Swiss-Prot record:
It comes from Caenorhabditis elegans. This is Bestrophin homolog 1. It catalyses: chloride(in) = chloride(out). Forms oligomers. Ca(2+) binds at residues 300, 305, 308. GO terms for cellular component: chloride channel complex; membrane microdomain; plasma membrane; presynapse. GO terms for biological process: gamma-aminobutyric acid secretion, neurotransmission; glutamate secretion; protein complex oligomerization; regulation of synaptic plasticity. Ligand-gated anion channel that allows the movement of chloride monoatomic anions across cell membranes when activated by Calcium (Ca2+). The keyword Transit peptide does not apply. One of its GO terms (molecular function) is chloride channel activity. It is found in: Cell membrane. Residues 52-60, 261-278 are extracellular. Residues 1-31, 83-242, 293-450 are cytoplasmic. It is a multi-pass membrane protein.
């Protein structure tokens, strides 16, 4: 099941996330407790053997081995491997959730475009919804063990009401060597839904070809999303990738069982404390092994972990919602004036409890900035100093030869004479083309000087 904890994190109090640590279902503690116990037992056994069962020479050899592994433990790039893989898995999980399939749009389109309160119009709408949901059921049966247990055979799909017996017979008639073994019959209910749309148009329940095309497009989008879910299950991430991550994490802590042993050399002055419990190594194990468990859970969200997708609940929700929409065609309220129809200023009401909570209305970050002006002088508008209109005005005073390079002699002074009549400056459509073709003009490289 999906563990929802949003209610507990509505505010950002210091203890908000701390309280989440005490949850068990779907928690990191439930995911890593077995591995942690095994790790600590192995660590403790080696520590006891080192301190009680080894001779002095064996202890010196073991201490050398500890120092050797401890200095080279960083050779395993654990943070890089885990971080990159988690990013890939989270992106994949997000894509699966976005395409898992919510049938509301198909139902709303069917309700809007297949019009009529007759029994046949209702049958058209309900069958289209049922066929679309049947596509999802067929895919989930082959991907999710929860759905497979719910519908172990196609006969159970009929018994649950998602198919009729004659539809199952037609469905089974498509069995070929290719279809039956490779499970490629997901397209059949989608084809039925599209054919129903065509028949509804032919019988006049859909008023125009445009409405029919819109309805077909929504069914096609639904089928495409379900296909993406199927494709992600069919083609997982390359096996060597999760193998590499799993191998890196487990070998890291296998080496840590020796590398993190606390050794105290009697002939040296050391300030180490002989602790029986490896506190920092324990914390590191929780973090890194928990990171690996996050990957394990999110890599296949159609499994049976606590936080995997609720496929059966989604099927129930879709068929209930879809048929409810299909049974209420054009069910709009009577057209009346709204409560604020005669109000100039709409009274915005709140409950007594929320009326004193301040609202921070939307506005731009610099919308309240007031720029200073010199006295009451109006703001003068002019073209940019590097614009083509400015360039034309500068060059209208005098032409220069091809080889003349000093154009500063024709610059304008920065007084009122330069600012006059900017609004009269115009740029005809052929100016730029003439400027490129007329070799008598010399384009200044720094027009901002003028």
């Amino acid at each position: 099941m999906t563990i929802n904890y949003h209610k507990e994190i509505m505010t950002s109090h210091p203890w908000t996330f701390f309280l989440l640590l005490f949850k068990w279902k779907g928690s990191i503690w439930k995911a890593v407790y077995m591995e942690t116990i095994i790790f600590l037992i192995c660590y403790g056994i080696i520590s006891v053997i080192y301190k009680t069962a080894m001779g002095e020479s064996s202890q010196r050899t073991f201490e050398s081995l500890v120092r050797y592994f401890d200095k080279r433990l960083s050779y395993i790039p654990l943070e890089f491997v885990l971080g990159f893989f988690v990013t890939t898995v989270v992106n994949r999980w997000t894509k699966l959730y976005q395409t898992i399939g919510f049938i509301d749009n198909v139902g709303l389109m069917a309700n809007c475009y297949i019009r009529g309160a007759t029994e046949k119009a209702r049958i058209y709408r309900r069958n289209i919804m049922r066929y679309c949901e049947l596509v999802q059921i067929l895919v989930f049966r082959d991907m999710s063990m929860r759905t497979r247990r719910r519908f172990p055979t196609m006969e159970t799909v009929v018994a649950a009401g998602f198919m009729n017996k004659h539809e199952l017979e037609l469905y089974n008639s498509y069995d070929t060597k290719y279809n039956s073994k490779l499970g490629t019959k997901y397209w059949i209910p989608a084809n039925w839904a599209l054919c129903m749309t065509y028949k509804a148009r032919k019988d006049g329940y859909i008023e125009s070809d445009y409405f029919k095309a819109q309805m077909e497009g929504e069914i096609r989008t639904w089928r495409t999303n379900i296909e993406w879910v199927c494709n992600y299950d069919w083609v997982p991430l390359p096996l060597m990738y999760p193998q590499l991550v799993c191998l890196a994490v487990n070998l890291y802590f296998l080496v840590s069982i020796i590398a993190r042993q606390l050794v105290i050399e009697k002939h040296k002055m050391v300030d180490e404390v002989d602790v029986y419990f490896p506190v920092m190594t324990f914390l590191q194990f929780i973090f890194y092994m928990g990171w690996l468990k996050v990957i394990d859970v999110m890599l296949n969200p159609f499994g049976e972990d606590d936080d995997d997708f609720e496929t059966n609940a989604l099927i129930d929700r879709n068929i209930t919602m879809g048929l409810m929409i299909a049974d209420n065609p054009m069910s709009t309220p009577e057209l009346r004036k709204d409560p604020f129809y005669d109000e100039v200023d709409v009274p915005l009401l709140y409950s007594e409890e929320s009326s004193n909570i301040p609202n921070h209305h939307y506005h731009g970050s610099v919308s309240e900035v007031r720029l200073e002006q010199k006295g009451n002088a109006p703001v003068m508008m002019m073209p940019h100093s590097q614009s083509a209109a400015n360039l034309r005005r500068m060059m209208s005073f005098k032409s220069v030869d091809e080889d003349e390079k000093d154009i500063n002699a024709f610059s304008m002074s920065h007084d009122d004479a330069r600012m006059r009549n900017w609004r009269e400056v115009s740029l005809d459509s052929s100016f730029l083309a003439d400027l490129n073709e007329n070799k008598e003009w010399k384009i200044p490289t720094n027009p901002q000087k003028f």
